Amino acid sequence: MSVERTLHHFPLDPASRQVRLALGEKRLPFVEMQVRYWEMPPEFTSLNPSGMPPVLVETKHQRNLVICETRAILEHIEETETEPPLLGRDPAERAEARRLLQWFDRKFDNEVNGFLLHEKMEKRLLRMGAPDLAALRQGREALRMHLGYIESLLQTRDWLAGRRMSLADFAAAAHLSVIDYFGDVPWKDFQAAKTWYMKLKSRPCFRPILADRWPGLAPAAHYDDLDF
């Protein structure tokens, strides 16, 4: 019997986007339930007490399996749906992919999203006032450092973790895609990173990401352009 999947997510959440990309790449159908997580709806917090997306609910034989938090969901998908593998085919690549997942979900999130997305998105959603220019500047400086790191990896690799595309690429692209939604990625100064991102952006699993829109938050003009 097939598994029915429902993903509770917020379209402009990098963590949610990672899961959507993984499900799409493995061609696993799922129903989307968009959640305004900042309002702490009880039907959502009953699934995940932390109140944060994404949450994946799998239904099989009329029984629900609720999986919370990005890494747990990604590891579950990889364990239960093994093709195509998204953590590498050898231990070294799997270890490197996991290291980079942690890099983007912790270091990039703290140093870049914690400033740019907080100022440009969270403040708007929570009606916290105008963006702080000093915080935006700090986030943009950190973003350039991370883009430089991506380029250093790509000097000797086809993809971030090695020879094959992996969840590390999806993690990086998920974070960058939300920053790019607001037009803050200086692609012209990082051509190797831009070429890598264009390859990901052209994959079928990325199409729903490029179609994302949120009322009152319009994307940059080039956001859904495959040849930007």
Curated annotation (Swiss-Prot):
Induction: Cell cycle regulated at the transcript and protein levels. mRNA levels peak in predivisional cells. InterPro entries: Glutathione-S-Trfase_C-like, Glutathione-S-Trfase_C_sf, Glutathione_S-Trfase, Glutathione_S-Trfase_N, GST_C, Thioredoxin-like_sf. CDD domains: GST_C_family, GST_N_family. Residues 90-223 form the GST C-terminal domain. Disruption phenotype: Deletion is lethal. Depletion results in cells that are elongated and grow into smooth filaments. Pfam families: GST_C, GST_N_2. Residues 3-85 form the GST N-terminal domain. Gene3D superfamilies: 1.20.1050.10, Glutaredoxin. It comes from the Bacteria. SUPFAM superfamilies: GST C-terminal domain-like, Thioredoxin-like. Keywords: Cell cycle, Cell division, Cytoplasm. One of its GO terms (cellular component) is cytoplasm. It is found in: Cytoplasm. Coiled coil: none annotated. One of its GO terms (biological process) is cell division. Homodimer. Interacts with FtsZ filaments. Probably interacts with the GTPase domain of FtsZ. Belongs to the GST superfamily. Essential cell division protein that must bind to FtsZ for division to occur. Critical coordinator of envelope constriction through its interaction with FtsZ. Promotes the formation of highly curved FtsZ filaments, reduces the GTPase activity of FtsZ and stabilizes FtsZ polymers. May regulate FtsZ function by modulating its superstructure. Does not bind to glutathione. This is FtsZ-localized protein A. It comes from Caulobacter vibrioides (strain NA1000 / CB15N) (Caulobacter crescentus).
